[in-house]
A protein has these predicted regions:
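Cyclic nucleotide-binding regulatory module and flanking cytosolic helices
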Residues: 1-28, 83
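Residues that recognize and position ribonucleotide moieties
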Residues: 29, 48, 70, 95, ...
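Cyclic nucleotide-binding regulatory domains
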Residues: 36-96
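A small-molecule sensor/coupling module
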Residues: 90, 109-146, 150
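Phosphate-/nucleic-acid-contacting segments
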Residues: 145-191
Length: 191
């Protein structure tokens, strides 16, 4: 929990009252690899801050194929934000891909913090801006870059995650097959 408080304090001043409120609404959870936090179709009212480990969000198409939208590593947030903000069932599943520790927040109570403690709003606004920019870049990268270029960006964005994530998740995130991922890695090794 202290990681999150320190992260907030490194960017914004935080009153002791706001800090105490965060402690009162947050719950630290230890999770096992394979554990599901959000399941597609469920009502979503939780958001998670990762302090250790790695998680991913994904959807499943009509043919049963998984498409990984996001990996979340230390100091990242993850949830199905579209479901929360539109008050609709989850379109994503969020699962642990390694043993992890997260800080769980009730999304409504997290939103209430802005009303009670306006100094917290810039921190969360920055997080949302980073999330939107990240997704925007991801869409553009999928449309404009080669598989090798996307793979190189993936390695920059998620250093060392390859050691913890199965190849089929990485291929899914990059929008390629596992065979294509093997070819991309072989090309990279030749350079």
């Amino acid at each position: 929990m202290q990681n999150l408080i320190n992260k907030i304090k490194s960017s914004f001043s935080l009153s002791s009252e706001a800090e105490n409120y965060i402690y009162s609404i947050a719950k630290e959870k230890k999770l096992s690899k394979g554990e599901i936090l959000i399941r597609e179709g469920q009502t979503v009212n939780k958001t998670f801050f990762v302090t250790q480990g790695s998680l991913r969000s994904f959807c499943i198409d009509d043919e049963g194929k998984e498409h990984t939208l996001q990996f979340a590593i230390k100091d990242w947030w993850i949830s199905d934000f579209m479901a929360i903000y539109n008050n609709e069932p989850a379109s994503l599943t969020v699962e642990c891909i390694s043993d992890s520790v997260v800080i769980e927040f009730n999304a409504q109570k997290l939103n209430e913090i802005y009303l009670q403690f306006p100094e917290f709003e810039p921190f969360q606004r920055k997080n949302l801006e980073r999330h939107v920019v990240s997704l925007h870049k991801r869409i553009l990268n999928q449309l404009q870059l080669t598989a090798l270029e996307r793979y190189n960006l993936f390695l920059e964005q998620y250093p060392n995650i390859e050691q913890h994530v199965p190849n089929y998740h990485i291929a899914s995130y990059l929008g390629i097959t596992q065979q294509s991922l093997s070819r991309v890695r072989a090309k990279k090794a030749k350079k």
